[in-house]
C-alpha cells in the first residue's frame, strides 16, 4: 500500500491561511488522502491541516515587535526544523511571511527536503539581491504575476506563474448597483471611493491630502458622494479625526466593509498604492493612486527601488495606465487635476485594458499551485 502524500506547510497570516485553504483543497481533489502538517489558521485547519503552533505566533509586524518576539520566533523555527527533519514531508510549502519562511526553507532544503515558496517577495521592485537568498532556500517559487516570473527567469531561479487568486475570486463583470444596495448607498448618485490605506501609518500621512482633494472635487461636483473604506474601528476613528480637523463641512460615508465592495459601488476611486490597486483594476473602476511614507523610509525606498512604477496595474502593463503620485506629489495640487480627468472621461479604453489584464492573470491559481508542486515531486497531475 502506497504511503499518503505528506506536505509540510506554514502560513504566517490571514491572507496566507486563505491561500493555504485553496491549495489544500486543490491537492485533495487529486490526492484525497494527502496529509498536511505545519502552521495554519482556521481555514487551513478546517481543511484538515495539523497545525503544530498557533498562526498568531508568526503574525508580527514592525521591527520593534519582531525584536520583542525574536526568542519565541527562533524557538518555533527550531521546533519546526526538528519536527520536519525527523518526519520528512514529500515537500514543504512556505506561504508568504518571507522573513520567517525563507530561513526555515533554507534549513529544510539543506537537510534534503524539497521546498516551495508561495507568493514571491517584491524582489522585482526593490532589493533585487534577495533573489540569491530565495534561490538558496527554495526549489520552486510560485508567482502571482507574469513579470515576477520574467524576473526570476533572468537569474535562472525556478519559478512558475500561477495567476492571481484575486483574479479568480473577482468576476469579469461587477455589479455597481448591487454593491450600492449592499452598502446602503444612494443608487442615483455619483460616488467616489476613498481608500487612504489599511495601516495607521498610511492613514496618518495619506488621509489629509485625499480629504483636501475631495474638498476641491466637491466644489466642482457638489452632488458627488464620497464613500470611505475603513478596515476596522481604529482606522474609522483615525480617518474621522483627520476629516473633522481638515474639512468638517464635507460629508463622508465611512463603511467598515471590504475595500472590494466599496470600490465596486463607486464610479471612480482615489486610493493608496498596494494590492488594493490591483483589486480596483479587477473590479474595473478608474483610479488615481497616491502614496506617502515618512521621508527617511521614502528616501531609502527610492535608493533601493528598481521599478519605474509603484502601482500594480502600471507594473503589470509596463506603462502608465493610471496616474500615480508618490511622496511630495501625493498632494491635492496633483491629485485633484488627475481625479478631475478621470471623472470627466468615459474611461472605456482603460476598462477594456483592465478586462484584458484580468483575463491574463486569471488561471485558477489554486489548481496551478497544486499542479506545480505535484510536478516538482514527480506526482501525476490533473491538467
Swiss-Prot record:
Protein keywords: Glycosyltransferase, Lipid A biosynthesis, Lipid biosynthesis, Lipid metabolism, Transferase
> Which region is the signal sequence?
none
GO CC entries: membrane
Listed GO MF terms:
lipid-A-disaccharide synthase activity; phospholipid binding
**Alphabetical list of InterPro entries matching this protein:** Glyco_trans_19
GO BP annotations, alphabetical order: lipid A biosynthetic process
Per the database entry, which stretches of residues form a coiled coil?
none
Checking SUPFAM superfamilies in the record gives: UDP-Glycosyltransferase/glycogen phosphorylase
| Pathway(s) the chain acts in | Bacterial outer membrane biogenesis; LPS lipid A biosynthesis
User: What reaction is this protein's catalytic activity?
Assistant: a lipid X + a UDP-2-N,3-O-bis[(3R)-3-hydroxyacyl]-alpha-D-glucosamine = a lipid A disaccharide + UDP + H(+)
- What function is annotated for this protein? Condensation of UDP-2,3-diacylglucosamine and 2,3-diacylglucosamine-1-phosphate to form lipid A disaccharide, a precursor of lipid A, a phosphorylated glycolipid that anchors the lipopolysaccharide to the outer membrane of the cell.
What family does the database annotate? Belongs to the LpxB family.
Protein name per Swiss-Prot or TrEMBL: Lipid-A-disaccharide synthase
Q: Which organism is it from?
A: Aliivibrio fischeri (strain MJ11) (Vibrio fischeri)
Tell me what gene encodes this. Answer: lpxB
